[in-house]
């Protein structure tokens, strides 16, 4: 479940995503990412479901995973990003699953309204999913106004139906050399993992693992 607590205020792209890898014959053949976007070309909001093959497309091309169309209008003409109105303070649940062999669907449910929207299907010959993670990709300046988002109820389900809910995560940050900012942070609060940007100071030391259990609280405290 994903929620924007403090929305961006600048005309820059923010992408908050759930990413999964596609597995076939014991190896990961590609990955897809789905989530909400704050997008300069989509004033009411956008949603994305797209991805890439590992090591390039099997038959050449740019490595982009093929997919179906969508009932949602395209943003800037591309297949991945679609217009989707969303609001800060509302909870959205993303689900990636296979409705048919060779098809992997992402859908988003507005939990306040109880409405589910199918984004589109990616067409990948894979028998399962692996390596789930969530991330924030922010193209704003480090000193732009703060933002805050929350992730909760991170869950993976086996083919048998057995569900596994994450109670801890491994943290990574983009390095300063690669264009990252020192004033972003991820911490645990209640039953949520919180991601913030635009802090007034550099983040404290970063733990390798962040857990919801106990009283760990803010990362590095």
Residue ranges and their predicted role:
Residues 1-68, 81, 180-181, 196, ...:
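Secretory/extracellular carbohydrate-interaction modules
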Residues 2-12, 132-221:
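Activation corresponds to long, low-complexity, non-globular regions
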Residues 13-15, 45-49, 103-109, 132, ...:
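Short, well-ordered strand-loop elements centered on a beta-strand within folded domains, enriched
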Residues 42-45, 98-104, 125-130:
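Generic structural signal for short, solvent-exposed loop/turn connectors between secondary structure elements
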Residues 65-93:
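Short, aromatic/His-centered strand-loop micro-motif at the edge of beta-sheets
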Residues 83, 109-130, 209-220:
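Extracellular glycan-recognition regions
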Residues 86-118:
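Carbohydrate-binding surfaces in secreted/extracellular proteins
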């Amino acid at each position: 479940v994903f929620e924007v607590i403090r929305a961006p205020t600048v005309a820059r792209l923010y992408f908050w995503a759930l990413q999964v890898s596609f597995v076939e014959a014991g190896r990961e053949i590609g990955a897809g990412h789905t989530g909400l976007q704050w997008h300069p070309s989509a004033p009411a909001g956008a949603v994305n479901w797209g991805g890439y093959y590992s090591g390039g497309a099997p038959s050449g091309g740019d490595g982009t995973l093929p997919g179906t169309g969508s009932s949602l209008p395209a943003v800037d003409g591309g297949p991945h990003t679609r217009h989707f109105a969303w609001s800060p303070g509302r909870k959205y649940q993303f689900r990636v699953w296979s409705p048919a062999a060779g098809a992997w669907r992402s859908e988003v449910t507005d939990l306040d309204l109880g409405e589910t929207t199918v984004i589109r299907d990616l067409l990948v010959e894979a028998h399962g999913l692996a390596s789930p993670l969530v991330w924030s990709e922010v193209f704003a300046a480090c000193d732009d106004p703060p933002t805050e988002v929350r992730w909760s109820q991170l869950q993976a389900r086996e083919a048998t139906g057995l569900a596994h809910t994450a109670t801890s995560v491994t943290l990574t940050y983009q390095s300063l050399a690669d264009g990252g900012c020192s004033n972003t942070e991820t911490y645990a609060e209640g039953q949520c993992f919180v991601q913030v940007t635009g802090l007034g100071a550099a983040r404290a030391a970063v733990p390798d693992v962040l857990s919801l259990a106990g009283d760990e609280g803010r990362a590095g405290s």
